[in-house]
Amino acid sequence: MSRPPLLSSACLAATCSLLLGGCVAAGDVRPYAAMAPIVPVVAPTVQPTAGAIYAAGPGLNLYGDRRARDVGDLLTITLIESTTASSSANTSTSKKDATTMASPTLLGAPLTVAGLDVLQNTLKGDRAFDGKGNTAQSNRMQGSVTVTVIQRLPNGNLVVQGQKNLRLNQGDELVQVQGIVRDADIAPDNTIPSSKVAEARIAYGGRGAIAQSNAMGWLSRFFNSRLSPY
């Protein structure tokens, strides 16, 4: 016995809904790829000259501190970023016009129809515009990232780069820092605040259940795009 067409359509719709629901699981539960091994940056070694007493090298500083100064050294950057921006605009315009056209006269008397002055006109115009806009944004980041010196510039400044990857319950958190620091700005404990990093590039992001919950679905992105007719 064949099933009614309406029942078959309902079963097909229910099956499709279950399949689509399984594709939209909460969080990315796929296994993570293995982390790439960290390759340390090592300063090039200078081969000693045969027969020479002294050879070029990093040297040993007996009385100095242990601050980063050479390629491959480590430096801790303290992230203290706080920005607040706000803007507001208010525009209001209005204009009114009024013009009265007198009725023409014939032999000193206005032309009337049933006692009404039908040729007398009054033109009026009234335009008004009122617009307001407000925007505000606030960002704050605190923490620390240990970076590696990848280049020492001729003026003594250090080009640093590093990242921190935290793998939590259902997601990854990644912090990347790049920039240029001065040797004089490095504290005795080999730290420097992020506010003293030139050409700073600080990126913070993540993926997983928390990051996915903050992202719009494909249908919501369509209705918020320029392609949406509404």
Swiss-Prot record:
InterPro entries: Flag_Lring. It is found in: Cell outer membrane; Bacterial flagellum basal body. The basal body constitutes a major portion of the flagellar organelle and consists of four rings (L,P,S, and M) mounted on a central rod. It comes from the Bacteria. NCBIfam families: PRK00249.1-4. One of its GO terms (cellular component) is cell outer membrane. It is a lipid-anchor. GO terms for molecular function: cytoskeletal motor activity. Belongs to the FlgH family. The gene is flgH. Assembles around the rod to form the L-ring and probably protects the motor/basal body from shearing forces during rotation. Keywords: Bacterial flagellum, Cell outer membrane, Lipoprotein, Membrane, Palmitate, Signal. One of its GO terms (biological process) is bacterial-type flagellum-dependent cell motility. A lipid is attached at C16 (N-palmitoyl cysteine). Residues 1-15 form the signal peptide. This is Flagellar L-ring protein. A lipid is attached at C16 (S-diacylglycerol cysteine).
